[in-house]
């Protein structure tokens, strides 16, 4: 389906520069776009590509359009303060237009407990299981092999992709998106040590602590593939509104993730940790348990957080990649820091003694 720039601006805003009747059918990168495609400039370092792009129109920020000067003549633009966000909204619209909603109903192979409540407008795919007391909201879509445990509530307009498992006693707010393989509500990692003795004479066991809380997920949350969110030990694990979680993230029991926070892939967050609003957690970050991150905290990739970070800011503890030889030299220096410290102390002591002797003379 083709849409004019005028139609896009009427829906999403922005100022048209050029021909508002220009029609676009899809989006594409600046260096690949054709005359029926819409491109966007989010990073000024690619400004030169705007001069050569074949795109029918470009989403651009006001300042970048000014930098183009005469090169903008004869081209079509939608000028907006945030071209990247504008692009995202247009892309979602094109997807919605290309893939109309599936027909409501329950697939014959699905297993729905008679005590469950499934909205008539919901879409229940093949081999889905919905246990007793579960509630599936209006227009929710559960794809093949989804499991929804007893008493769990799935909000309106949510989409659970194939092979998602939502354990008992959990809540997903409206418009939640949960990707394949994600598990929400599995037991938190809670074991009480009950050992006596020392060494080889030590006897006893780890005693499992029942995890009787749930997981509460707010509205407009997206959870990536193969991500796991543990249920609380006594109170709920809470994921606040508009949180976006990447693939392969582990969130321990009793954590609370503040609204609008984003968490990149392979991050691990130990139990009872609180992360504030509008935080950004980089890939492979490890966060210890029982710590608190304040609002607007950014932790860069592969950093380890072992204590609370209450103040907004950017935090890094990862060692950036360097050439192999440089790393070996740095590692050798680190291994010998204690010897270097002892030598410096000895030199300082000798220097102090010499200065003392000179003063006495």
Curated annotation (Swiss-Prot):
Stored InterPro entries: Hexapep, Hexapep_transf_CS, LpxD, Trimer_LpxA-like_sf, UDP_GlcNAc_AcTrfase_non-rep
PROSITE patterns: HEXAPEP_TRANSFERASES
Disulfide bonds: none
The protein's Enzyme Commission number: 2.3.1.191
Pathways per UniProt: Bacterial outer membrane biogenesis; LPS lipid A biosynthesis
An example Gene Ontology molecular-function term: N-acyltransferase activity
Keyword Transferase on entry: yes
Key words of the record: Acyltransferase, Lipid A biosynthesis, Lipid biosynthesis, Lipid metabolism, Repeat, Transferase
Cellular component terms (Gene Ontology): membrane
Catalyzed chemical reaction(s): a UDP-3-O-[(3R)-3-hydroxyacyl]-alpha-D-glucosamine + a (3R)-hydroxyacyl-[ACP] = a UDP-2-N,3-O-bis[(3R)-3-hydroxyacyl]-alpha-D-glucosamine + holo-[ACP] + H(+)
CDD domains the record matches: LbH_LpxD
Subunit and interaction comment: Homotrimer.
Family statement drawn from the similarity comment of this UniProt entry: Belongs to the transferase hexapeptide repeat family. LpxD subfamily.
PANTHER family linked to this entry: UDP-3-O-ACYLGLUCOSAMINE N-ACYLTRANSFERASE, UDP-3-O-ACYLGLUCOSAMINE N-ACYLTRANSFERASE 1, MITOCHONDRIAL-RELATED
Role this protein plays: Catalyzes the N-acylation of UDP-3-O-acylglucosamine using 3-hydroxyacyl-ACP as the acyl donor. Is involved in the biosynthesis of lipid A, a phosphorylated glycolipid that anchors the lipopolysaccharide to the outer membrane of the cell.
Protein name, entry field: UDP-3-O-acylglucosamine N-acyltransferase
The species this protein was found in: Burkholderia pseudomallei (strain 1710b)
Organism placement in taxonomy: Bacteria, Pseudomonadati, Pseudomonadota, Betaproteobacteria, Burkholderiales
């Amino acid at each position: 389906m083709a849409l004019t720039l005028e139609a896009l601006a009427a829906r999403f805003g922005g100022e048209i520069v050029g021909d508002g009747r220009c029609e676009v059918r899809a989006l594409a990168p600046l260096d690949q776009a054709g005359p029926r495609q819409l491109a966007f400039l989010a990073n000024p370092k690619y400004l030169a590509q705007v001069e050569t792009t074949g795109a029918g129109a470009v989403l651009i920020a006001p300042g970048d359009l000014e930098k183009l000067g005469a090169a903008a003549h004869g081209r079509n633009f939608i000028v907006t303060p945030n071209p990247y966000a504008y692009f995202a909204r247009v892309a979602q619209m094109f997807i919605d237009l290309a893939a109309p909603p599936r027909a409501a109903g329950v697939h014959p192979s699905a297993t729905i407990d008679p005590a469950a409540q499934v909205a008539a407008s919901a879409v229940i795919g093949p081999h889905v299981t919905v246990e007793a007391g579960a509630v599936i909201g209006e227009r929710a879509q559960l794809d093949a092999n989804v499991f929804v445990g007893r008493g769990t509530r799935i909000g309106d307009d949510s989409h659970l992709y194939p092979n998602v498992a939502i354990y008992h006693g959990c809540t997903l707010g409206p418009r939640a998106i949960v990707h394949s393989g994600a598990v929400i509500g599995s037991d938190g990692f809670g074991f009480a040590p009950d050992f006596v003795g020392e060494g080889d004479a030590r006897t006893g066991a780890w005693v499992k602590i029942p995890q009787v809380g749930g997981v509460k997920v707010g509205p407009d949350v997206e959870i990536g593939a193969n991500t796991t969110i543990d249920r609380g030990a006594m109170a709920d694990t809470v994921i606040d509104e508009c949180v976006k979680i990447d693939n392969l993230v582990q969130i321990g029991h009793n954590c609370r993730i503040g609204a609008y926070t984003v968490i990149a892939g392979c991050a691990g967050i130990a139990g009872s940790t609180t992360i504030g609003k509008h935080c950004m957690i980089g890939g492979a970050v490890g966060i210890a348990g029982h710590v608190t991150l304040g609002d607007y905290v950014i932790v860069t990739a592969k950093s380890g957080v072992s204590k609370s970070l209450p103040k907004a800011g950017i935090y890094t503890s990862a060692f950036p990649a360097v050439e192999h030889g440089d790393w070996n030299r740095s590692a050798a220096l680190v291994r010998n820091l204690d010897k270097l410290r002892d030598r410096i102390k000895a030199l300082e002591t000798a220097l102090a003694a010499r200065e003392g002797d000179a003063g006495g003379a």
